[in-house]
Amino acid sequence: MKETKEIRMEKGKPYPLGWTENADGSVNLAAVLERSKECGVLLYPRRGGAPRRLAFREEDRIGKICCMKLIGLDAQEYEYNFYCGEEVITDPKARRICGNEKWGKKISPSLRSDSTEDAFDWKNDRRPQIPYENSIFYQLHVRGFTKHTSSGVTAKGTFAGLAEKIPYLKSLQVTAVELMPVYEFTELEAVKPLRQNAYPAKDQEGNPVEETLPRINYWGFKKGYYFAPKASYSVKDPVLEFKEMVRAFHAEGMEVILQFYFPKEINREMILEVIRYWVCEYHIDGVHLMGEQIPVGILAADPMLTDTKLIYYGFPYEEIYPVGQVPVSYTHLTLPTT
């Protein structure tokens, strides 16, 4: 029987939130968790078996943040979650999400966070940086665009399948694909109880029938795990496959724009961090922002996002850009939808 390695806990740092591997091989874990309950970390061995449970101590709390440093942990051997009382919490900062690889299948028992980071050779990748006024966007749903047999691709419903369609998109003179949400989200949603004014499903006799099957949120415009590409949109490795897709589009002089939906409970700092992450880690060319309380001004003023396309309905460009420095006449920018 293989011995369980000893893991030593020390006081950690509150930022950055999530899982961070330090230069000395230790791992820092930090999360916003309730103060009134016992909270901690669950470590799931990749080879199987019961999770290891490590509780945060009182001295590990700084404000609402719990943090710890783990020494002796082999990061490649574990997936993880946080817990608070009886609730298991998947890390909103996780760079990969495990357990939702099959589209429309029930998640059991819960999603798990994964910190794995693999090196990727971007080769000579360069962002095309096509001016707005010369852009022709093609909006699509990754799964819907390539899932049907008529798409003619091998890897149907995936990032790899979309890359196979580049010649077709180029033939339409498209300069950029705008992808509906590709961050990880749970598409299965609980059935809501029938409301008095709703239009319920009916049987052949016209009698209301209580729905029992979960509904599928096909489009993904909901709160999600914003740092992880959607696993069910890949053949095997969503991180690698998404990067390969972006690199393939760039090689043909085409841009990749992502749609993000942020409900009002997502704070402004988180939104900025998400966009910066995708620009740095995945080399995306722009974002189409949707939701409430989007900090458009902060994003537009961020030096790192100067060359990133920012699309937002009702964009307050006159409040953001100096006179004469607006990047495009927005009255001439159109977004075809297919």
Residue ranges and their predicted role:
Residues 25-29:
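Structural beta-strand segments of beta-rich domains
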Residues 31, 140, 179, 278:
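Conserved, mostly hydrophobic/aromatic
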Residues 33-38:
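Short proline/glycine-enriched turn/loop motifs at strand-loop junctions of beta-rich domains
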Residues 165-181:
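Catalytic domains of carbohydrate-active enzymes, especially glycoside hydrolases
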Residues 190-251, 264-281:
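Aromatic- and acidic-residue-enriched carbohydrate-binding clefts of CAZyme catalytic domains
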Residues 251-252, 261-319:
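Active-site neighborhood of glycoside hydrolase catalytic domains
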Residues 331-337:
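Conserved small/polar residues in nucleotide/adenosyl-binding loops
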